[in-house]
């Protein structure tokens, strides 16, 4: 029976649940593992996961804590973006979009007076974020490591904070590299929308904890209103924006993989492992 819950995390799944051409038990995805409890750790052991690819930035790890995984599981810190050589903000993509919503002064007609205008602005911001994904420092390194681990036959769980944006990007490229149809790739990606309520609750909690005293009711209302589905959910056009950047900058996914140092032989081995 497929395991569909990871206690202490959310947005968890075996990618093979949706991408049924994949062998089960090879590629998993989830939110952060910083609150994994004993039952969650037991689940990881039962699933036979050997490696965790943590795509969070160093600041996210410091702020939220490392993954609480069992001994014997290798954790690969693959910050995306990697600020060791990049001056960009190291917030999670949805956090960056959320900050833009909070600080927007309405000068561009995006004052957020209605829920629809907030969601429209959020969608634009998230699309902009995804458009930059392929060229962000750390993106190709993260993809290279995940592909290499999978090609070596090691069951991998990939995660970021929410398990939807950076994780969604990396998983989508893995699935495309092994030859899965676009509709299957998008179907797995969109499943993260089922976890929006948990993400909204977690972010609301984080916002509250950043203040020494309880927020004024009007501030809470203003803030929560900007936790729109455009920021917290995923859309097919977000993934398409990232994919367009790959084609425009590298010519094709193959070109992107080669630039990342991923050989065709490695891709072939990964395909053999994942498809059987």
From Swiss-Prot:
SUPFAM superfamilies: (Phosphotyrosine protein) phosphatases II. Keywords: Host cell membrane, Host cytoplasm, Host membrane, Hydrolase, Membrane, Protein phosphatase, Secreted, Virulence. GO terms for cellular component: extracellular region; host cell cytoplasm; host cell plasma membrane; membrane. The record marks 164 as: Important for substrate specificity. The important role played by PtpB in virulence and the lack of PtpB human orthologs make it a highly promising target for the treatment of tuberculosis infections. Several classes of potent inhibitors have been developed and studied to date. Drug candidates include, among others, (oxalylamino-methylene)-thiophene sulfonamide (OMTS), isoxazole-based compounds, highly substituted indolo[2,3-a]quinolizidines, benzofuran salicylic acid derivatives, chalcone derivatives and several 2-oxo-1,2-dihydrobenzo[cd]indole-6-sulfonamide and piperazinyl-thiophenyl-ethyl-oxalamide derivatives. One of its GO terms (biological process) is symbiont-mediated suppression of host programmed cell death. GO terms for molecular function: phosphatase activity; phosphatidylinositol-4,5-bisphosphate phosphatase activity; phosphatidylinositol-4-phosphate phosphatase activity; protein serine/threonine phosphatase activity; protein tyrosine phosphatase activity; ubiquitin binding. It comes from the Bacteria. Changing residue 166 to A: Shows less than 1% of wild-type activity. It is found in: Secreted; Host cytoplasm; Host cell membrane. Its main location: secreted. Its EC number is 3.1.3.-, 3.1.3.16, 3.1.3.48. It catalyses: O-phospho-L-tyrosyl-[protein] + H2O = L-tyrosyl-[protein] + phosphate; O-phospho-L-seryl-[protein] + H2O = L-seryl-[protein] + phosphate; O-phospho-L-threonyl-[protein] + H2O = L-threonyl-[protein] + phosphate; 1,2-dioctanoyl-sn-glycero-3-phospho-(1-D-myo-inositol-3-phosphate) + H2O = 1,2-dioctanoyl-sn-glycero-3-phospho-(1D-myo-inositol) + phosphate. Changing residue 160 to S: Shows less than 1% of wild-type activity. Does not affect macrophage apoptosis. Binding to host ubiquitin is required to activate the phosphatidylinositol phosphate phosphatase activity. Phosphatase activity is inhibited by sodium orthovanadate, a specific inhibitor of tyrosine phosphatases, but not by okadaic acid, an inhibitor of serine/threonine phosphatases. Inhibition of the enzyme reduces mycobacterial survival in infected macrophages. Inhibitors also enhance killing efficacy by first-line antibiotics. Residues 232-250 are annotated as: UIM-like region. The record marks 165 as: Important for activity. Essential virulence factor that promotes mycobacterial survival within host macrophages. Acts as a phosphatase that possesses triple substrate specificity toward phosphotyrosine, phosphoserine/threonine and phosphoinositides. Supports mycobacteria survival during infection by modulating the normal host signaling pathways, attenuating the bactericidal immune responses and promoting the host cell survival. The UIM-like region mediates binding to host ubiquitin. Adopts a simplified PTP fold, which combines features of the conventional PTPs and dual-specificity phosphatases. In the presence of OMTS inhibitor, the enzyme undergoes a large conformational change, allowing the inhibitor to bind deep in the active-site pocket. PANTHER family: TYROSINE SPECIFIC PROTEIN PHOSPHATASES DOMAIN-CONTAINING PROTEIN, TYROSINE-PROTEIN PHOSPHATASE. This is Triple specificity protein phosphatase PtpB. It comes from Mycobacterium tuberculosis (strain ATCC 25618 / H37Rv).
């Amino acid at each position: 029976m497929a395991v569909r819950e990871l206690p202490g995390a959310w947005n968890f799944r075996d990618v093979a649940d949706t991408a049924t051409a994949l062998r089960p038990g090879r590629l998993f995805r989830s939110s952060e593992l910083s609150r994994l409890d004993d039952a969650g750790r037991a689940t990881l052991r039962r699933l036979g996961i050997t490696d965790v690819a943590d795509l969070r930035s160093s600041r996210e790890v410091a702020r939220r804590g490392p993954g609480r995984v069992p001994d014997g599981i290798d954790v690969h810190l693959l910050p995306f973006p990697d600020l060791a050589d990049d001056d960009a903000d190291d917030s999670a993509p949805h956090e960056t979009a959320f900050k833009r919503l909070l600080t927007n002064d309405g000068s561009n007609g995006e004052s957020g007076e209605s829920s629809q205008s907030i969601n429209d602005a959020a969608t634009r911001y998230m699309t902009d974020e995804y458009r930059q994904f392929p060229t962000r420092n750390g993106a190709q390194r993260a993809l290279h490591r995940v592909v290499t681990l999978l090609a070596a036959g090691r069951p991998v769980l990939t995660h970021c904070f929410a398990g939807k944006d950076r994780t969604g990007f990396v998983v989508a490229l893995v699935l495309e590299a092994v030859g899965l149809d676009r509709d299957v790739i998008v179907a797995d990606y969109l499943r993260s929308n089922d976890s929006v309520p948990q993400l909204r609750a977690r972010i609301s909690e984080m916002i509250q904890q950043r203040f020494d005293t309880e927020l004024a009711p009007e501030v809470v209302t203003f803030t929560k209103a900007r936790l729109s589905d455009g920021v917290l959910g995923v859309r097919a056009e977000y993934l398409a924006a990232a994919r367009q950047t790959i084609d425009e900058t590298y010519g094709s996914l193959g070109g992107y993989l080669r630039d990342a140092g991923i050989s065709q032989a490695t891709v072939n081995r990964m395909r053999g492992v994942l498809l059987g």
